[in-house]
From Swiss-Prot:
Transmembrane segments: none
GO terms of biological process kind: D-glucarate catabolic process
Alphabetical list of PANTHER family matching this protein: 5-DEHYDRO-4-DEOXYGLUCARATE DEHYDRATASE 2-RELATED (PTHR12128:SF19), DIHYDRODIPICOLINATE SYNTHASE (PTHR12128)
Protein name per UniProt: Probable 5-dehydro-4-deoxyglucarate dehydratase
Enzyme class, UniProt record, top EC level: lyase
Source superkingdom: Bacteria
Family the UniProt entry places it in: Belongs to the DapA family.
Biological classification of the source: Bacteria, Pseudomonadati, Pseudomonadota, Gammaproteobacteria, Pseudomonadales
Amino acid sequence: MTPQELKSILSSGLLSFPVTDFDAAGDFDAESYARRLEWLAPYGASALFAAGGTGEFFSLGLDEYPRIIKTAVDTCAGSVPILAGVGGPTRQAIHMAQEAERLGAKGLLLLPHYLTEASQEGVAAHVEAVCRAVKIGVVVYNRNVCRLTPALLEQLAERCPNLVGYKDGLGEIELMVSVRHRLGERFAYLGGLPTAEVYAAAYKALGVPVYSSAVFNFIPRTAMEFYKAVAADDQVTVGRLIDDFFLPLLEIRNRRAGYAVSIVKAGVRVIGHDAGPVRAPLTDLLPDEYERLAALIRKLGPQ
């Protein structure tokens, strides 16, 4: 798949990031992960991102990363494109990017570098180095310490033909408008805030109709229903699901730092597709929080 073909795929439809399955000992469970992907693939996501933020990229070992990507690519071959999360220090990100390309990933999501503060020029050099190390398409994730300006994104777009996507995890409307205006059709634009459904209608009005859905992991039918309602400007359906599900979900998610991932793993457990616990430093939901989530999910009906 060429970078431009990837850009075309990412320019429409719903995206998602499967959780990564761990066994009781906390090790990667390839068989359970494959079953998860087999279950999710038919629901109609345009692409799935293996080892993304919701997939606990930040806690994955370099030894298990290739197994995760290979399992995803092999399981979804011919059904849905797999993009791989990459990140960390520049050399590590390059190593992961090349491994993912070798294993058949159709593209990469370049997650923010870890902790280290860096200048705009330093972050741009990091992004460029990863892009130049592979031929497949790359999506850069503007979030946390990775805050590229429209001017630098434009320079990167000129120097890196395979940089084809921009994912926004900052939620700064002025910046998003500026990036969209300056780069035009050069990129595919993805909404990437946690529980992106809450912001979906607003981002669509900015010219960003595509977003990644974490809840697709455990309520894929409802996630697709919501996406289609936003696309069709069906404000009745959007409002109903926001009020009945997403806002109550946020009340649970916002109780503790890290729950944006923990609540997804709890959700898949509720529906009978348990992926095991989250890895430290994240913590699982407390029992009362889990029961509140389960009640919300049950109200939505079969998925």
